[in-house]
Protein backbone atom coordinates (compact mmCIF):
# COMPACT_ATOMS: atom_id res chain seq x y z
CA UNK A 1 0.00 0.00 0.00
CA UNK A 2 2.48 2.61 -1.19
CA UNK A 3 0.88 6.03 -0.81
CA UNK A 4 2.35 9.50 -1.20
CA UNK A 5 2.94 11.27 2.10
CA UNK A 6 3.32 14.87 3.19
CA UNK A 7 7.09 14.50 2.67
CA UNK A 8 6.55 13.91 -1.06
CA UNK A 9 5.16 17.41 -1.75
CA UNK A 10 6.57 20.92 -1.61
CA UNK A 11 4.63 22.96 0.94
CA UNK A 12 6.41 26.32 0.75
CA UNK A 13 4.00 29.23 0.12
CA UNK A 14 1.22 26.66 -0.39
CA UNK A 15 -2.24 26.67 1.13
CA UNK A 16 -2.29 23.22 2.72
CA UNK A 17 -5.68 21.68 3.48
CA UNK A 18 -5.37 19.18 6.33
CA UNK A 19 -8.25 16.84 7.22
CA UNK A 20 -7.47 16.06 10.84
CA UNK A 21 -9.38 13.96 13.35
CA UNK A 22 -10.33 16.43 16.08
CA UNK A 23 -13.39 14.41 17.15
CA UNK A 24 -12.61 14.89 20.86
CA UNK A 25 -14.92 14.40 23.86
CA UNK A 26 -16.39 17.68 25.13
CA UNK A 27 -18.25 18.28 28.37
CA UNK A 28 -19.92 21.69 28.80
CA UNK A 29 -17.61 23.10 26.13
CA UNK A 30 -14.47 21.76 27.82
CA UNK A 31 -12.26 19.13 26.16
CA UNK A 32 -11.99 16.12 28.49
CA UNK A 33 -9.31 14.29 26.46
CA UNK A 34 -7.03 16.01 23.93
CA UNK A 35 -5.22 12.87 22.67
CA UNK A 36 -6.45 13.34 19.11
CA UNK A 37 -5.26 16.94 18.97
CA UNK A 38 -1.85 15.93 20.31
CA UNK A 39 -1.69 13.08 17.76
CA UNK A 40 -2.17 15.56 14.89
CA UNK A 41 0.66 17.89 16.01
CA UNK A 42 3.53 16.30 14.02
CA UNK A 43 1.67 16.82 10.73
CA UNK A 44 0.58 20.38 11.62
CA UNK A 45 4.09 21.35 12.78
CA UNK A 46 5.59 19.91 9.59
CA UNK A 47 3.35 22.20 7.50
CA UNK A 48 4.33 25.23 9.62
CA UNK A 49 8.06 24.42 9.59
CA UNK A 50 8.07 23.91 5.83
CA UNK A 51 6.51 27.28 5.06
CA UNK A 52 2.95 26.18 4.32
CA UNK A 53 -0.32 27.73 5.45
CA UNK A 54 -2.21 25.13 7.50
CA UNK A 55 -5.98 25.07 6.92
CA UNK A 56 -7.41 22.48 9.31
CA UNK A 57 -10.86 20.92 9.45
CA UNK A 58 -12.59 17.98 11.13
CA UNK A 59 -15.94 16.61 12.19
CA UNK A 60 -16.94 16.55 15.85
CA UNK A 61 -19.78 14.31 16.98
CA UNK A 62 -22.95 13.69 15.00
CA UNK A 63 -24.92 16.63 13.69
CA UNK A 64 -28.26 16.11 11.98
CA UNK A 65 -30.38 19.06 13.15
CA UNK A 66 -29.80 22.72 14.08
CA UNK A 67 -30.20 21.72 17.75
CA UNK A 68 -27.37 19.17 17.39
CA UNK A 69 -24.92 21.99 16.69
CA UNK A 70 -24.97 23.08 20.33
CA UNK A 71 -21.74 22.04 22.03
CA UNK A 72 -20.24 20.68 18.79
CA UNK A 73 -18.22 23.70 17.68
CA UNK A 74 -14.50 23.28 16.99
CA UNK A 75 -13.78 26.61 18.73
CA UNK A 76 -12.53 24.99 21.99
CA UNK A 77 -10.37 22.70 19.85
CA UNK A 78 -8.79 25.67 18.04
CA UNK A 79 -8.08 27.28 21.44
CA UNK A 80 -6.45 24.11 22.78
CA UNK A 81 -4.43 23.71 19.59
CA UNK A 82 -3.13 27.26 19.98
CA UNK A 83 -1.91 26.39 23.51
CA UNK A 84 -0.23 23.20 22.29
CA UNK A 85 1.48 24.90 19.33
CA UNK A 86 2.42 28.04 21.26
CA UNK A 87 1.16 30.26 18.46
CA UNK A 88 -2.12 31.92 17.45
CA UNK A 89 -4.71 29.79 15.66
CA UNK A 90 -7.45 31.56 13.72
CA UNK A 91 -10.90 30.03 14.18
CA UNK A 92 -13.53 30.65 11.49
CA UNK A 93 -17.08 29.85 12.70
CA UNK A 94 -18.38 28.72 9.29
CA UNK A 95 -17.83 25.85 6.87
CA UNK A 96 -18.06 28.00 3.74
CA UNK A 97 -18.55 31.63 2.79
CA UNK A 98 -16.85 35.00 2.54
CA UNK A 99 -15.45 35.06 6.08
CA UNK A 100 -13.67 31.74 5.48
CA UNK A 101 -12.38 32.74 2.03
CA UNK A 102 -11.06 36.10 3.31
CA UNK A 103 -9.38 34.45 6.30
CA UNK A 104 -7.66 31.92 4.01
CA UNK A 105 -6.53 34.63 1.58
CA UNK A 106 -5.06 36.69 4.43
CA UNK A 107 -2.89 33.83 5.74
CA UNK A 108 0.89 34.11 5.78
CA UNK A 109 3.33 31.20 5.59
CA UNK A 110 3.35 29.32 8.90
CA UNK A 111 -0.14 30.50 9.90
CA UNK A 112 -2.75 28.06 11.22
CA UNK A 113 -6.50 28.27 10.68
CA UNK A 114 -9.30 25.97 11.85
CA UNK A 115 -12.75 26.19 10.30
CA UNK A 116 -16.03 24.95 11.75
CA UNK A 117 -17.19 21.33 12.22
CA UNK A 118 -17.58 19.74 8.76
CA UNK A 119 -20.74 17.93 9.90
CA UNK A 120 -22.56 21.26 10.29
CA UNK A 121 -22.98 20.71 6.52
CA UNK A 122 -25.16 17.65 7.30
CA UNK A 123 -28.01 19.74 8.71
CA UNK A 124 -29.25 20.75 5.29
CA UNK A 125 -29.17 17.51 3.32
CA UNK A 126 -26.18 15.44 4.54
CA UNK A 127 -23.70 17.24 2.31
CA UNK A 128 -20.62 16.16 4.30
CA UNK A 129 -21.45 12.54 5.08
CA UNK A 130 -23.22 12.10 1.73
CA UNK A 131 -20.03 13.19 -0.07
CA UNK A 132 -21.69 16.09 -1.91
CA UNK A 133 -19.52 16.78 -4.98
CA UNK A 134 -20.10 20.53 -4.93
CA UNK A 135 -19.01 20.79 -1.28
CA UNK A 136 -15.87 18.72 -1.93
CA UNK A 137 -15.07 20.98 -4.86
CA UNK A 138 -15.60 24.12 -2.77
CA UNK A 139 -13.28 22.95 0.02
CA UNK A 140 -10.66 21.84 -2.53
CA UNK A 141 -10.76 25.35 -4.06
CA UNK A 142 -9.44 26.80 -0.78
CA UNK A 143 -6.07 25.04 -1.05
CA UNK A 144 -3.20 23.91 -3.27
CA UNK A 145 -2.44 20.58 -1.58
CA UNK A 146 -4.64 18.19 0.43
CA UNK A 147 -3.23 16.20 3.37
CA UNK A 148 -5.53 13.48 4.70
CA UNK A 149 -4.50 12.68 8.27
CA UNK A 150 -7.84 11.40 9.59
CA UNK A 151 -7.56 7.61 9.68
CA UNK A 152 -10.61 7.41 11.96
CA UNK A 153 -12.88 8.33 9.03
CA UNK A 154 -10.88 6.55 6.30
CA UNK A 155 -13.61 3.90 5.99
CA UNK A 156 -16.15 6.59 5.07
CA UNK A 157 -16.50 8.43 1.78
CA UNK A 158 -17.24 11.98 2.93
CA UNK A 159 -16.90 15.35 1.23
CA UNK A 160 -14.02 16.26 3.57
CA UNK A 161 -11.84 13.33 2.49
CA UNK A 162 -12.92 11.57 -0.73
CA UNK A 163 -14.84 14.59 -2.06
CA UNK A 164 -11.83 16.91 -1.91
CA UNK A 165 -9.43 14.26 -3.25
CA UNK A 166 -11.64 13.42 -6.22
CA UNK A 167 -11.27 16.95 -7.62
CA UNK A 168 -7.70 16.08 -8.66
CA UNK A 169 -5.94 18.23 -6.04
CA UNK A 170 -2.60 16.61 -5.04
CA UNK A 171 -3.62 14.33 -2.14
CA UNK A 172 -1.14 12.85 0.33
CA UNK A 173 -1.17 11.11 3.72
CA UNK A 174 -0.21 12.92 6.93
CA UNK A 175 2.08 11.25 9.46
CA UNK A 176 -0.73 9.65 11.48
CA UNK A 177 -2.35 8.17 8.38
CA UNK A 178 1.05 6.98 7.15
CA UNK A 179 1.70 5.15 10.45
CA UNK A 180 -1.71 3.45 10.35
CA UNK A 181 -1.18 2.29 6.75
CA UNK A 182 2.31 1.04 7.63
CA UNK A 183 1.37 -0.97 10.71
CA UNK A 184 -2.12 -2.30 10.05
CA UNK A 185 -1.69 -2.53 6.28
CA UNK A 186 1.57 -4.46 6.67
CA UNK A 187 0.09 -6.81 9.28
CA UNK A 188 -2.68 -7.77 6.90
CA UNK A 189 -0.73 -7.78 3.65
CA UNK A 190 2.72 -8.98 4.63
CA UNK A 191 3.08 -9.95 8.32
CA UNK A 192 6.25 -11.26 9.92
CA UNK A 193 5.43 -14.75 11.17
CA UNK A 194 4.22 -16.25 13.43
CA UNK A 195 1.24 -13.85 13.21
CA UNK A 196 -1.22 -14.07 16.13
CA UNK A 197 -4.54 -12.22 16.23
CA UNK A 198 -6.46 -11.75 19.48
CA UNK A 199 -10.12 -10.87 19.08
CA UNK A 200 -12.53 -9.97 21.84
CA UNK A 201 -15.54 -7.77 22.39
CA UNK A 202 -19.19 -8.58 22.73
CA UNK A 203 -20.39 -9.68 19.32
CA UNK A 204 -19.30 -12.25 16.78
CA UNK A 205 -21.32 -10.34 14.20
CA UNK A 206 -18.95 -7.34 14.51
CA UNK A 207 -15.90 -9.51 13.86
CA UNK A 208 -17.11 -12.14 11.35
CA UNK A 209 -15.42 -10.51 8.37
CA UNK A 210 -12.22 -10.01 10.38
CA UNK A 211 -12.13 -13.68 11.40
CA UNK A 212 -12.85 -14.80 7.83
CA UNK A 213 -10.02 -12.66 6.47
CA UNK A 214 -7.57 -13.60 9.24
CA UNK A 215 -8.19 -17.35 8.93
CA UNK A 216 -6.30 -17.02 5.64
CA UNK A 217 -3.59 -14.76 7.06
CA UNK A 218 -2.93 -15.49 10.75
CA UNK A 219 -1.16 -18.49 12.28
CA UNK A 220 -3.35 -18.36 15.39
CA UNK A 221 -6.58 -16.57 16.32
CA UNK A 222 -7.29 -16.31 20.06
CA UNK A 223 -10.93 -15.58 20.89
CA UNK A 224 -12.13 -13.99 24.15
CA UNK A 225 -14.85 -11.62 25.30
CA UNK A 226 -18.58 -12.07 24.84
CA UNK A 227 -18.14 -13.41 21.32
CA UNK A 228 -16.44 -16.57 22.67
CA UNK A 229 -19.75 -17.94 24.02
CA UNK A 230 -21.26 -18.24 20.56
CA UNK A 231 -18.26 -20.41 19.59
CA UNK A 232 -18.60 -22.50 22.77
CA UNK A 233 -22.28 -23.04 21.98
CA UNK A 234 -21.25 -24.11 18.47
CA UNK A 235 -19.04 -26.76 20.10
CA UNK A 236 -22.15 -28.12 21.81
CA UNK A 237 -21.55 -26.71 25.30
CA UNK A 238 -24.09 -24.96 27.49
CA UNK A 239 -23.22 -21.29 28.06
CA UNK A 240 -25.78 -20.57 30.80
CA UNK A 241 -26.94 -16.96 30.75
CA UNK A 242 -23.86 -15.74 28.87
CA UNK A 243 -24.12 -13.37 25.95
CA UNK A 244 -25.09 -15.45 22.93
CA UNK A 245 -25.94 -14.73 19.32
CA UNK A 246 -28.19 -17.72 18.58
CA UNK A 247 -28.46 -16.81 14.90
CA UNK A 248 -24.65 -16.92 14.53
CA UNK A 249 -24.02 -20.38 16.05
CA UNK A 250 -23.98 -22.18 12.67
CA UNK A 251 -21.66 -19.55 11.27
CA UNK A 252 -19.33 -19.95 14.27
CA UNK A 253 -19.33 -23.69 13.60
CA UNK A 254 -18.32 -23.21 9.97
CA UNK A 255 -15.61 -20.70 10.94
CA UNK A 256 -14.17 -23.25 13.39
CA UNK A 257 -14.19 -25.95 10.71
CA UNK A 258 -12.43 -23.62 8.30
CA UNK A 259 -9.85 -22.51 10.87
CA UNK A 260 -9.01 -25.92 12.33
CA UNK A 261 -6.52 -25.65 15.18
CA UNK A 262 -5.77 -22.01 14.33
CA UNK A 263 -8.73 -20.94 16.47
CA UNK A 264 -8.10 -21.01 20.24
CA UNK A 265 -11.01 -20.60 22.69
CA UNK A 266 -11.03 -19.95 26.46
CA UNK A 267 -10.57 -23.10 28.57
CA UNK A 268 -11.97 -21.51 31.72
CA UNK A 269 -14.47 -18.75 32.41
CA UNK A 270 -15.22 -16.37 35.28
CA UNK A 271 -18.96 -16.59 35.97
CA UNK A 272 -21.49 -14.79 38.14
CA UNK A 273 -25.25 -14.86 38.69
CA UNK A 274 -25.48 -11.12 38.07
CA UNK A 275 -24.01 -8.60 35.68
CA UNK A 276 -22.55 -6.59 38.55
CA UNK A 277 -19.17 -5.89 40.08
CA UNK A 278 -20.65 -6.47 43.56
CA UNK A 279 -21.98 -9.96 42.83
CA UNK A 280 -20.04 -13.07 43.96
CA UNK A 281 -18.05 -14.71 41.14
CA UNK A 282 -16.00 -17.86 40.61
CA UNK A 283 -14.12 -19.66 37.83
CA UNK A 284 -15.34 -22.80 36.05
CA UNK A 285 -14.08 -24.83 33.07
CA UNK A 286 -15.61 -23.37 29.89
CA UNK A 287 -17.36 -26.70 29.31
CA UNK A 288 -19.22 -26.41 32.63
CA UNK A 289 -20.89 -22.99 32.79
CA UNK A 290 -23.90 -23.33 35.15
CA UNK A 291 -27.35 -22.69 33.67
CA UNK A 292 -28.07 -19.84 36.09
CA UNK A 293 -24.77 -17.96 35.63
CA UNK A 294 -23.12 -15.93 32.89
CA UNK A 295 -19.53 -15.72 31.73
CA UNK A 296 -18.02 -12.26 32.27
CA UNK A 297 -14.28 -12.80 31.75
CA UNK A 298 -11.67 -15.38 30.74
CA UNK A 299 -10.10 -17.34 33.64
CA UNK A 300 -6.50 -17.66 34.85
CA UNK A 301 -5.82 -20.83 32.83
CA UNK A 302 -6.94 -19.09 29.65
CA UNK A 303 -4.72 -16.08 30.38
CA UNK A 304 -1.84 -18.56 30.72
CA UNK A 305 -2.87 -20.43 27.56
CA UNK A 306 -3.09 -17.20 25.54
CA UNK A 307 0.27 -16.00 26.93
CA UNK A 308 1.83 -19.29 25.80
CA UNK A 309 0.29 -19.01 22.33
CA UNK A 310 1.82 -15.52 22.08
CA UNK A 311 5.36 -16.69 22.87
CA UNK A 312 7.61 -16.30 19.85
CA UNK A 313 5.02 -14.32 17.85
CA UNK A 314 6.51 -11.75 15.47
CA UNK A 315 3.27 -9.91 14.62
CA UNK A 316 0.36 -9.48 17.03
CA UNK A 317 -2.93 -7.68 16.37
CA UNK A 318 -5.31 -7.22 19.30
CA UNK A 319 -8.86 -5.95 18.95
CA UNK A 320 -11.45 -6.10 21.72
CA UNK A 321 -11.44 -6.79 25.48
CA UNK A 322 -11.47 -10.30 26.99
CA UNK A 323 -14.24 -9.58 29.50
CA UNK A 324 -16.35 -6.82 31.03
CA UNK A 325 -13.34 -4.57 31.37
CA UNK A 326 -15.31 -1.70 32.96
CA UNK A 327 -15.87 -3.84 36.08
CA UNK A 328 -12.65 -4.46 38.04
CA UNK A 329 -13.60 -8.05 38.97
CA UNK A 330 -13.92 -8.93 35.28
CA UNK A 331 -10.99 -6.92 33.93
CA UNK A 332 -8.27 -9.45 34.82
CA UNK A 333 -8.42 -11.25 31.46
CA UNK A 334 -7.98 -8.05 29.47
CA UNK A 335 -5.18 -6.91 31.79
CA UNK A 336 -3.46 -10.31 31.57
CA UNK A 337 -3.56 -10.39 27.78
CA UNK A 338 -2.44 -6.76 27.58
CA UNK A 339 0.56 -7.54 29.82
CA UNK A 340 1.45 -10.66 27.83
CA UNK A 341 1.51 -8.70 24.56
CA UNK A 342 3.32 -5.71 26.08
CA UNK A 343 6.11 -7.95 27.36
CA UNK A 344 6.80 -9.69 24.05
CA UNK A 345 10.25 -9.00 22.73
CA UNK A 346 11.07 -8.53 19.09
CA UNK A 347 7.42 -8.47 17.95
CA UNK A 348 5.38 -5.89 16.09
CA UNK A 349 2.38 -5.36 18.37
CA UNK A 350 -0.70 -3.52 17.21
CA UNK A 351 -3.89 -2.55 19.00
CA UNK A 352 -6.87 -1.96 16.72
CA UNK A 353 -8.42 0.97 18.56
CA UNK A 354 -11.46 1.13 20.81
CA UNK A 355 -11.63 -0.54 24.23
CA UNK A 356 -8.33 -2.40 23.85
CA UNK A 357 -6.55 0.90 23.30
CA UNK A 358 -8.25 2.38 26.38
CA UNK A 359 -7.13 -0.65 28.41
CA UNK A 360 -3.49 -0.35 27.33
CA UNK A 361 -3.43 3.39 28.04
CA UNK A 362 -5.12 2.94 31.42
CA UNK A 363 -2.53 0.31 32.38
CA UNK A 364 0.32 2.57 31.33
CA UNK A 365 1.46 0.22 28.57
CA UNK A 366 0.91 2.52 25.61
CA UNK A 367 4.64 2.90 24.95
CA UNK A 368 5.18 -0.85 25.00
CA UNK A 369 3.09 -1.40 21.86
CA UNK A 370 4.46 -0.75 18.38
CA UNK A 371 1.23 0.94 17.38
CA UNK A 372 -2.12 1.85 18.91
CA UNK A 373 -4.63 2.63 16.18
CA UNK A 374 -6.66 5.83 16.33
CA UNK A 375 -9.56 4.42 14.33
CA UNK A 376 -11.79 1.66 15.67
CA UNK A 377 -14.08 1.16 12.67
CA UNK A 378 -11.41 1.98 10.11
CA UNK A 379 -8.86 -0.43 11.57
CA UNK A 380 -11.49 -3.19 11.71
CA UNK A 381 -12.31 -2.71 8.03
CA UNK A 382 -8.61 -2.78 7.16
CA UNK A 383 -8.30 -6.06 9.12
CA UNK A 384 -11.28 -7.33 7.12
CA UNK A 385 -9.23 -6.80 3.98
CA UNK A 386 -11.55 -4.09 2.68
CA UNK A 387 -10.54 -1.14 0.56
CA UNK A 388 -11.04 2.05 2.56
CA UNK A 389 -12.33 4.95 0.44
CA UNK A 390 -10.32 7.54 2.40
CA UNK A 391 -7.12 5.57 1.80
CA UNK A 392 -7.87 4.72 -1.81
CA UNK A 393 -8.28 8.44 -2.60
CA UNK A 394 -4.70 9.27 -1.51
CA UNK A 395 -2.27 9.48 -4.46
CA UNK A 396 -0.11 6.40 -5.03
CA UNK A 397 3.66 6.77 -4.91
Swiss-Prot record:
Catalysed reactions, as listed in the record: (2R)-3-phosphoglycerate + ATP = (2R)-3-phospho-glyceroyl phosphate + ADP
Name assigned to this protein: Phosphoglycerate kinase
Residues engaged in binding ATP: 207, 295, 326, 353-356
Protein encoded by which gene: pgk
Domain of life: Bacteria
UniProt cross-references to InterPro entries, sorted A to Z: Phosphoglycerate_kinase, Phosphoglycerate_kinase_CS, Phosphoglycerate_kinase_N, Phosphoglycerate_kinase_sf
Species of origin: Enterococcus faecalis (strain ATCC 700802 / V583)
Gene Ontology biological process: gluconeogenesis; glycolytic process
Enzyme class, UniProt record, top EC level: transferase
Alphabetical list of Pfam families matching this protein: PGK
SUPFAM superfamilies attached to this UniProt entry: Phosphoglycerate kinase
Protein location: Cytoplasm
Binding locations of substrate: 21-23, 36, 59-62, 119, 156
Annotated keywords: ATP-binding, Cytoplasm, Glycolysis, Kinase, Nucleotide-binding, Transferase
EC number: 2.7.2.3
Cellular component, GO annotation: cytosol
Main localization category: cytoplasm
Subunit architecture: Monomer.
Amino acid sequence: MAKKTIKDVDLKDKKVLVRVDFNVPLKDGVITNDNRIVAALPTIKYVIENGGKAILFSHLGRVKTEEDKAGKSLKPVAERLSELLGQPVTFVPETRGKELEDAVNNMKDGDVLVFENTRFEDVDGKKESGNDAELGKYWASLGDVFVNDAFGTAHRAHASNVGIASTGIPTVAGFLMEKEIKFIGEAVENPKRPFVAILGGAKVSDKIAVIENLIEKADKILIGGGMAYTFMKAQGYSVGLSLLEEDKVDLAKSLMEKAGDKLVLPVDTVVSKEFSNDAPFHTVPSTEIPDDEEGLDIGEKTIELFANELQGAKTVVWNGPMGVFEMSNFAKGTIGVCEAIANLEDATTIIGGGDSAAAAIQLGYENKFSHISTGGGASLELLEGKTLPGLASINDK
